[in-house]
Regions:
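Conserved alpha-helical substructure of the radical SAM core
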Residues: 2-117, 313-317
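Flexible mid-to-C-terminal extensions adjoining Fe-S/redox cofactors in radical SAM and related proteins
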Residues: 252-320
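Alpha-helix termination/capping residues and helix-transition junctions
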Residues: 75, 117, 186-187, 281
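Radical SAM enzyme [4Fe-4S]-AdoMet core and its adjacent flexible, acidic
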Residues: 1, 121, 126, 133, ...
Length: 320
């Protein structure tokens, strides 16, 4: 009997091998971006203080225009798309049209509405607390945590539904890191978890959520300790975790950032977002973005550490 991963890989490669080869050429030979983030919608029902709220509101492209945009990116050799917002599930029909055009996809969602199985797509669910009280407080929406549990349980009960939890630690919730890992590693609703720390954003009104240097150092220490307890569920290598330390981030700048260099970001009107997904309003010297720790963790380390980080990145993607 064939391994299930092998049976998934064969049709995936038959469908996508030309664009995968073109993407490798873009990155390795031409030094061009090979992935992009796209704001599927410019709307969100959640009341948190995320980077999106500090950006200008725009007129969304039509479904047909977005599909055309993604098809063009595929022809150019882009191999990964991050489907974000706002809240991407504000436009569920559009998600169904664009997911799978690009070989690898993340849908980053707050889980406010029922979730759909999408081809070649991992759902990245935003969870900022181990309890409804904490999560709903951070997210500014009462009852949201209970809705996430309901929607994830329903989606997972229908069969294969690749899911990664994403937690952004801030001054209000960082002390609950261990509880979040304990809860989500045992409830059967996710395949892993990724951790970011809050990146300060101008005009986001996030002052009460910003981490002190001491808190950021403590988070790195806690993550290194917890990695031994959750070696598979915590989708971060030691190299990635150490990239969150203030001694490392204080040297970051857009010209040296692999996220800014290799991953383009677009708003819901199809216009480039300056710098990166967080925009040029982000304070790079306190960057805690998981995408940056992933890309940064593949360089400047031993061969073993680089391969481990690459394998961790692949765990967050799906061929199915």
């Amino acid at each position: 009997m064939l391994n299930p991963e092998f049976t998934s890989a064969v049709p995936f490669l038959l469908k996508h091998y030309p664009v995968l080869l073109k993407g490798l050429h873009r990155r390795a030979s031409l030094g061009l971006p090979y992935a992009f983030s796209f704001n599927i919608s410019d709307r969100c029902p959640v009341g948190c203080h995320c980077y999106w709220r500090a950006q200008e509101r725009v007129a969304e492209l039509s479904d047909e225009e977005v599909v055309s945009f993604f098809q063009k990116k595929r022809r150019e050799g882009y191999v990964q798309a991050n489907l974000i917002g706002g809240e991407p599930y504000v436009r569920p029909q559009l998600l169904g049209k664009v997911a799978g055009i690009i070989p690898f996809n993340w849908v980053v969602t707050s889980g406010t509405t029922p979730l759909r199985r999408l081809p070649h797509t991992t759902h990245v669910i935003s969870i900022d607390g181990a309890t409804g009280e904490i999560h709903d407080s951070v997210r500014g929406m009462k009852g949201l945590y209970a809705r996430i549990l309901k929607h994830l349980a329903a989606a997972r009960s229908r069969g294969d539904f690749p899911t990664i939890i994403h937690t952004t630690l801030n001054a209000q919730n960082y002390a609950g890191l261990e509880a979040i890992l304990a809860t989500w590693s045992s409830n059967g609703l996710a395949d892993g978890i990724m951790i970011s720390t809050l990146t300060p954003i101008r005009e986001a009104e996030d002052e009460s959520y910003r981490l002190s240097r001491e808190q950021r150092v403590q988070i790195v220490s806690d993550l290194l300790r917890l990695k031994s307890h959750y070696p598979k569920f915590l989708c971060m290598t030691e190299a990635m975790i150490r990239r969150l330390h203030p001694d490392h981030t204080e040297r970051l700048q857009p010209a040296l950032c692999d996220t800014a260099r290799w991953i383009e970001s677009y708003d819901a009107a199809g216009k480039r977002v300056p710098q990166c997904v967080l925009s040029d309003k982000a304070d790079c010297k306190e960057c805690g973005c998981i995408i940056t720790t992933m890309s940064d963790g593949t360089k400047g380390s031993s061969i073993g550490a680089m391969l481990e980080t690459a394998a961790t990145m692949m765990k967050t993607l799906t061929l199915r």
